[in-house]
Amino acid sequence: MNKKETRHRLIRSLISETTIHTQQELQERLQKNGITITQATLSRDMKELNLVKVTSGNDTHYEALAISQTRWEHRLRFYMEDALVMLKIVQHQIILKTLPGLAQSFGSILDAMQIPEIVATVCGDDTCLIVCEDNEQAKACYETLSHYTPPFFFSNK
C-alpha cells in the first residue's frame, strides 16, 4: 500500500470513529498517527474521499458522502458524450484523449468506479493513460469503456 492509500485509509477511519470538526483538527490527528501533510494535500484527500461538512443541531463535523456506482457511471457517460476525443488500445494500455483540461476528471471518475482491470490512471491536460495488467485485461477494459461512449462515437472509425 502506498503513502496515499495508507493516508486515505487512516482519514476514513478517523472520520468514521471520531467527530472531526475542522481540517486543522484532522491534520493534527493525522500527525499524532505519524502522518504529516500540508493543508493543500489534506484538502485534495478530503475531496477524493468525498468528505463533506454536515450540521447536526449546533454541531458541524465531517462525514464521508457515499456516491453510488450508478452515479459514477452516469458521470462517465456524460463526460464520454461531451469530452471524449479518442479511445485507443495500445498493448496493455488504453489512451483516452479528451478536450483540453478534462483528462484528470476522467481519471478521477475511472478511479472512483474501481474498474477491476484498471491498475492505474495517469492523466495530463487532455490525455488519460489507463494502465492494465496485460493485453487481455486492456481489451476487457476497452470493452467496458466502450459501453459508455455515445452510439455515434465508433461509427466513423
From Swiss-Prot:
Involved pathway(s): Amino-acid degradation; L-arginine degradation via ADI pathway
InterPro entries in UniProt: Arg_repress, Arg_repress_C, Arg_repress_C_sf, Arg_repress_DNA-bd, WH-like_DNA-bd_sf, WH_DNA-bd_sf
Signal peptide: none
Predominant cellular place of this UniProt entry's protein: cytoplasm
Subcellular location: Cytoplasm
Family (UniProt): Belongs to the ArgR family.
PANTHER family hit by this protein: ARGININE REPRESSOR
Protein's name in the database: Arginine regulator
